[in-house]
């Protein structure tokens, strides 16, 4: 009998610590609130994007992915921001395989980026 390999996709995530430092320098006391709110928004929008995909709502998914891209860019999550932009493009392309793969990658990156920024900010998960 042939064994079927089990794939466990993983993503290398990174948060641009210089970008986070810039936020804290520019915003001073308000930075904690802004970063916490942005983290919360990402934590809500990532599963919402998955729901929109399952409901076959590509227009709404594109808007959700665009907002994820904007939030991620503000927090220095450059790879997540780029891949969320790719999800937006896939919604317009009409290629269901590309959309499924890219959305899955965005979710993996998003979850990993949130874990990393929580560690950097010393926030409980």
Positions of predicted regions on the chain:
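Two-component system phosphorelay core
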Residues: 1-63, 67-74, 78-125
